[in-house]
Each structure stands twice: as structure tokens, then as C-alpha cells.
């Protein structure tokens, strides 16, 4: 799990702990001791805040433990934001679509661990390196049957016009073989309270090119607007400032 630390506090901690528990269940790990995790987070954040004024990246790692047997192992680390984050927040980024090699039905194949937060980042990192070679900063995965899934480290959110012409925020359904984003969930909750319509919908790459804005939403980069997709410039996003503000509000909603 990766959390943002801002103003000396972890953002959306309880949502991340809930996802830690769910991922542990999917991987047949013992249920994590959430109070112990809260104590570890509090200690790490306090020590970070003693020496740093800026934001930090907090990672929670939970494993089965030693190969020889014994109890599970858990630890937390905290460090500075990657250099790429400030630029992606400020300027947006270029992305490419890539076939993930999974059908939508992969969520019914538990041995693939689709939808679990794991340390198996080989495919995600390889995809990001491939994007970099193509001159892009991120990736949007597509299922083998042509539907949008997620980014290697983010959730896809688009803005479009609803039935009455009002803004409508959409994201792929959580029953797809994806990791449901904590930041996306918090964003939708805040957006609904502000009067926005939000929903899940089956989306295809074509929807990205006709949308009124495309964002890759995550705990650290927050809302990175996709301004170029597969080498094609996307239309301007009228809601760019609004979405950025909603995500900022969402970050503190679960404290």
C-alpha cells in the first residue's frame, strides 16, 4: 500500500488499511493486525514530520514471512516524493494504451490475483519502461476484449456529459480485474456531495478520445490529467481545476 503523507498526517489511512485486509484475504494471508499497523504508521509519520516539512510517500508492506515458516512480516517505510510527481500534477502527462493480456473475466480467476495489491510489479514496471521509450509518462491498460482497465499505479477517471448535459464522472467497474482505487472512491464521494454525477461504466479507448477530460488518479500523483494519448492530443479539460480541488478535498475526507 502506498499513502501520501501531508501536513504531518497520512491521507486516507483507513481506506488503505481496508484494502490491505482485502488483499491479504485474496492472497490467503492472515488477517493483518490493524491496530499494529496504525501504530507503525503513527511512528513513521511522526519521525518524518520531525525532519521534513513537505509531503512524503508512506509504504506498507505485508508478507507471508520467512520461507522456513513462522509469523507474517509487516513493515512501513517513508520517503520523499518521486521527482516525476510535481510535473504530472502541474502539467499532466502523455500516456499510451497497452493490452494487459487479461479478459474481463479474469476477476473470476483468483489464482491470477487480479485486483489484489501485491509486490508483483514486473508487468507494471515493464509497461512504464515501454511507455518511456515511446515518449510517454504513463500507461492505460486495456483488456484483451477491448475495455479500459486501469493504469499500472492509478485508476482511470473520465469526465463526459450526462443525460441532462451536466458533467458526469466515470470509471471502469470495480468488478473488473483491477485494483479499486482508494483515491478514486474518495473523489467520487466528495464529488457526489458537491452535486456531480459519478458512476461505473464499461469504457473503451474511443471514450478517452471523446471525453471532456481524462485523469489517472492515485494516492501520490493525485489527479494527473492525460493531455496526449497514443500520440494524439486530447481536447482541453474544462473541469481540470475542479477535479484537482475535489481530489485535494478527498485526501482529508478519511482522516
Regions found by a protein language model. Give the residues of each.
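Helix-start/capping segments and mature chain N-termini
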Residues: 1-35, 39-43, 63, 67-255
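Phosphate/pyrophosphate-binding loops at sites that engage ATP/ADP/AMP, CoA/4′-phosphopantetheine
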Residues: 45-51
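Ordered, amphipathic secondary-structure segments that act as subunit-interaction surfaces
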Residues: 51-61
Amino acid at each position: 500500500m502506498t499513502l501520501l503523507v501531508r501536513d504531518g498526517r497520512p491521507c486516507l489511512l483507513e481506506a488503505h488499511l481496508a484494502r490491505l485486509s482485502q488483499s491479504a484475504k485474496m492472497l490467503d494471508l492472515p488477517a493483518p493486525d490493524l491496530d499494529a499497523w496504525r501504530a507503525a504508521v503513527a511512528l513513521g509519520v511522526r519521525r518524518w514530520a520531525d525532519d521534513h516539512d513537505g509531503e512524503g510517500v508512506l509504504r506498507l508492506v505485508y508478507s507471508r514471512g520467512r520461507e522456513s515458516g513462522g509469523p507474517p512480516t509487516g513493515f512501513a517505510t517513508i520517503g520523499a516524493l518521486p521527482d516525476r510527481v510535481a510535473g504530472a500534477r502541474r502539467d499532466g502527462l502523455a500516456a499510451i494504451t497497452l493490452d494487459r493480456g487479461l479478459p474481463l473475466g479474469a476477476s473470476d480467476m483468483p489464482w491470477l490475483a487480479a485486483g489484489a495489491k501485491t509486490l508483483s510489479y514486473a508487468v507494471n514496471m515493464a509497461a512504464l519502461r515501454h511507455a518511456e521509450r515511446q515518449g510517454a509518462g504513463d500507461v492505460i491498460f486495456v483488456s484483451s476484449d477491448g475495455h479500459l482497465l486501469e493504469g499500472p499505479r492509478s485508476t482511470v477517471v473520465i469526465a463526459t456529459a450526462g443525460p441532462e448535459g451536466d458533467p458526469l464522472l466515470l470509471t471502469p467497474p470495480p468488478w473488473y480485474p483491477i485494483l479499486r482505487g482508494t483515491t478514486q472512491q474518495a473523489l467520487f464521494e466528495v464529488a457526489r456531495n458537491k452535486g456531480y454525477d459519478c458512476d461505473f461504466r464499461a469504457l473503451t479507448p474511443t471514450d478517452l478520445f471523446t471525453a471532456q477530460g481524462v485523469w489517472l488518479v492515485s494516492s501520490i500523483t493525485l489527479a494527473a490529467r492525460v493531455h496526449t494519448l497514443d500520440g494524439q492530443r486530447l481536447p482541453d479539460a474544462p473541469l481540470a481545476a475542479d477535479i484537482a480541488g475535489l481530489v485535494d478535498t478527498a485526501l482529508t475526507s478519511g482522516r
